[in-house]
Design a protein with these regions (language model features):
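Conserved PLP-binding catalytic core of the aspartate aminotransferase-like
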Residues: 61, 305-313, 318-353, 363, ...
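PLP-dependent enzyme catalytic core of the Aspartate aminotransferase-like
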Residues: 6-7, 65, 69-73, 77, ...
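Conserved PLP-anchoring active-site segment centered on the Schiff-base-forming lysine
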Residues: 124-143
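Short, structured coil segments at secondary-structure junctions
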Residues: 131, 151-153, 207, 238
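Active-site phosphate-binding strand-loop segment of PLP-dependent enzymes
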Residues: 57, 157, 161-213
């Protein structure tokens, strides 16, 4: 018992040292609870009323009454949970309906649901690829893609972010592989850049590779009808596999999916470990997901409102003198470069009633610190102007503008 106790203390002291180093480097993350539903107008646990400019709530559906009503109805009709994985007794008719609805939205063959997009990516690569195959991955892909690749025995190649010359070089280097899969985010979440899927699919055809896109920051609002980054580039028919989420624009609860060619989805149902060994998506989330997709299939009103809001804020924030990353996406990185300044600006903006977060190394490269603003269709013009006024005041205070 004494030796076990010594071992425990050694582990605890080691972890304390790591936490201390994280704090000393200014990288310690602090959660700021809110006491209201997720929306544009939120209330912090301190009772402060603020405008939320940092949520993935792109279409303003997180607290939409139609989704809430759909979830409540599903609770009454289908119950709270399934207490099972899909292949035992965890598949209800609404799970198949949501999969069919997603397939229709993407015009794909079939769809498989997961607890999250992280799980969808985690269960993708090791299922489809083996040691004689190769993955060519963008250097700025999401952590879930990186972790999913780590679980796979395939050869690994990486190309510079959105760099088509480097991608082609890696495709040439990997020509000994039997199957080659190009993996990319549809939108890179720290910069708001949309992947060059038109050029990626051209290279994939040239070198006989398949293409996988994680469209979590695009599904529902990028492209003229919100079908995502592939629609934006007019290459919907050239993507083999999409992964995405219900946890951002589509209500923001949880749940992910993989959609694409039938043979890929069939194999995932048989062998994808996160799918086989995780509980089924809850009926309430499933039903609300169906409702969200049907809303977006009927009208582009929310997507169009988001586009209008994004263009307005990008134009006005640049006009104030702030440096932002160029683009069209509602992710708008406002550059401070200095990590400490980013944190101070975020704190000052909170006092002005604007809830944003500073991002810095290791989330972004060193000396690339920023405030990441995320625009929503739920924002009114007065919301946007209030934020712009606050940014102007704080920007002048810290000599950013």
């Amino acid at each position: 018992i004494r030796e076990l106790w010594k071992g425990y203390l050694r582990v605890v002291n080691s972890f304390k040292k790591i936490i201390s180093e994280i704090k000393d480097e200014g990288l310690y993350k602090v959660e700021r609870p809110i006491s209201s539903p997720q929306s544009i107008d939120i209330v912090t646990d301190k009772g402060l009323n603020v405008l939320n400019f940092c949520a993935n709530n792109y279409l303003g559906l997180a607290n939409h009454p139609d989704l809430i009503a759909s979830a409540k109805q599903a609770l009454d009709e289908y119950g709270f949970g399934m207490a099972s994985v899909r292949f035992i007794c965890g598949t209800q008719t609404i799970h198949k309906e949501l999969e069919d609805t997603i397939s229709q939205f993407f015009n794909s063959d079939d769809t498989i649901l997961y607890s999250s997009c992280f799980d969808a990516n985690g269960g993708l690569f090791e299922t489809l690829l083996g040691q004689n195959d190769a993955i060519i991955s963008d250097s700025l892909n999401h952590a879930s893609i990186i972790d999913g690749i780590r679980l796979c025995k395939a050869q690994r190649y990486r190309y510079k972010n959105n760099d088509m010359d480097d991608l082609e070089e890696q495709l040439i280097n990997s020509q000994n592989a039997e199957i080659r899969l190009i993996a990319t985010d549809g939108v890179f979440s720290m910069d708001g850049y949309i992947a060059n899927l038109d050029l990626i699919t051209t290279l994939a055809k040239k070198y006989d590779a398949i293409v996988m896109v994680d469209d979590s920051h695009a599904t529902g609002f990028i492209g003229k009808t919100g079908r995502g980054s592939a629609e934006y580039h007019n290459v919907m028919d050239k993507i083999d596999i999409w992964t995405s989420t219900l946890g951002k624009a589509l209500g923001g609860a949880s749940g992910g999916f993989t959609t694409g060619r039938k043979e890929f989805i069939d194999l995932l149902r048989q062998r994808s470990r996160p799918y086989l060994f995780s509980n089924t998506l809850t009926p309430a989330i499933t039903s609300a997901g169906i409702k969200a997709f049907k809303m977006l299939s009927k009208s582009t009103e929310l997507r169009d409102k988001l586009d209008k809001n994004t263009k307005y804020f990008r134009r006005e924030i640049s006009g104030l003198g702030f440096e932002i990353k160029n683009g069209e996406h509602p992710i708008i990185p406002i550059m401070t470069y200095d990590a400490l300044i980013a944190q101070k600006v975020a704190s000052a903006l909170l006092k002005e009633g604007i809830y944003v977060i500073g991002f810095f190394y290791p989330v972004v490269p060193k000396n690339e610190a920023r405030i990441r603003v995320q625009i929503s269709a739920g924002m009114s013009l007065s919301h946007l102007d209030q934020a712009l006024d606050a940014f102007k005041k704080v920007g002048e205070k810290f000599n950013i503008i």
